UniProtKB/Swiss-Prot annotation:
PANTHER family: NICOTINIC ACID PLASMA MEMBRANE TRANSPORTER, PERMEASE-RELATED. It holds the Pfam family MFS_1. Its main location: Golgi. It is a multi-pass membrane protein. This is Uncharacterized transporter C1002.16c. GO terms for molecular function: carboxylic acid transmembrane transporter activity; transmembrane transporter activity. GO terms for biological process: carboxylic acid transmembrane transport. One of its GO terms (cellular component) is Golgi apparatus. InterPro entries: MFS, MFS_dom, MFS_trans_sf. Belongs to the major facilitator superfamily. Allantoate permease family. It is found in: Golgi apparatus; Membrane. The lineage of its organism: Eukaryota, Fungi, Dikarya, Ascomycota, Taphrinomycotina. The chain crosses the membrane at residues 51-71, 98-118, 127-147, 155-175, 187-207, 220-240, 301-321, 325-345, 352-372, 378-398, 412-432, 444-464. It comes from the Eukaryota.
Amino acid sequence: MKSLSHTSSNKSNGSIFTKADESEKVISRSNTASPISIENTHLTKSERDSLLFRLDLVLAPTIMILYLVAFLDRSNIGNAKVAGLPEDLKLKGDQFNIIASVFYVTFILFEMPTTLLMKKVQPKRMLAFIVISYSLTTIFTGFCHNFGGLLAARLVLGFCEAGLFPCLALYLTMIYSRVELAPRIAYLFASSALSGAFGGLFAYAVLHMDGVGGFAGWRWLFIIEGLIGFVCGVAVYFIIPNDITKAWFLSKTHQEMMRKRQLERAADLEAAHFDWKGVKSAFTDFKVYLYALSEFGQDTCLYGFSTFLPAIISGMGYTSLSVQYMTIPVYILGAATYIAASFLSDRFHHRGIILIIGNIFPIVGYILLLACQNNKSVLYFACYLCSVGVYTGAGLNVTWLSANIAPHYKRATAISLQLAIANSSGILAGQIYRYPPKYIAGHLTSLIAIFISTVLHVVNIFFLKHQNSKKQKSLASSSTIDLSEQPKDDKDARFHYIL
């Protein structure tokens, strides 16, 4: 056992790194304790960088494509709307808004069960099943002929897609350390933005097939996107490894490096058996609900913006085909800014302040959408401002929670709980954009939602800072804590919350 100094501690005086990962900062200590750097652990910095490069080379494009296809299948209903779907299916009143919202009913209900099952079922099987099932559902959506059929298809699609994001996020936490997560989960949310850009470009091309084979262009949109997803689902079974230490894309040397990393993170990863204690701990943790409520506001904007952006731009007076390509640069900006923000948060080990800064842009954007109803140029510019923070806020907040929850089953439950509460915002988002062309109710609701989320991020920063201070005092006053051991969970005094 190492005894701890009883002298006053200060963050600037040094830092302790756990064996959980060579780069994970756990708690700041007094200057009587020698900091353990990356070079003192089993892997050198060059070895670590080499390993991460090999992992990212295969995993990054794989998860990006999977989530891009999923978000494309989910949000292409917006492209189909401006391409004539409501008229062809004779939708009346608020039936389209119901179609947009009902997806999230089954999506919410099945997120948590799917995530908790992933480790038992095995990642490659679970992910392949999810992708193939939602792709087939998307294909069948192209053959719907009335409101009832489309309603059923959207309910099934919600069930099939429910586990994809939490399973991918959880899978990444099994491979990457807490401070390495931000840019990796960034790939997922960047994909959601890119799906809008790709969806607009793809829709612009496919809608020219209107009438081919007797099918409307929006039907071809669903059919072709579903076929692409099906191919991806089959491929992922052979690409994603269940055991990363035996991954086919790692050399023998890199496999050995990965084994060392996993041994160093053993306490967090060893949960081979289901742990009800971890599940219960997630449900009783105050900060999980703080993350979930702030994510609810972020996702209200995300789902409203990503689903109805074509309709919002169409309401400015542009033609159906023009709308499809006008959405592309807006989505690309959203993806680019989110990736940049995630790398900044990873570099400086801060999430909250970047979330707050990012949210300023959509707050201004929604104000412009409400205040400048008769100026098309300003309205279109406002869409760019919204895209800057909409994707950044939703993505970084999930990363923030993932980095501050441990061990495995508590993290799995917390991610699922956060997303279940947050994704219920999709039901709200589907209902607020119902009064074209100005969509005042939608923009006002989104403005209020993102403002409240920003306030909650501020509260969360102060809460976590207070908890870190308490942990630091506990370490400074204890003479029995073994610093050579990993934190058992995020409540452990050696576990430092990322702000």
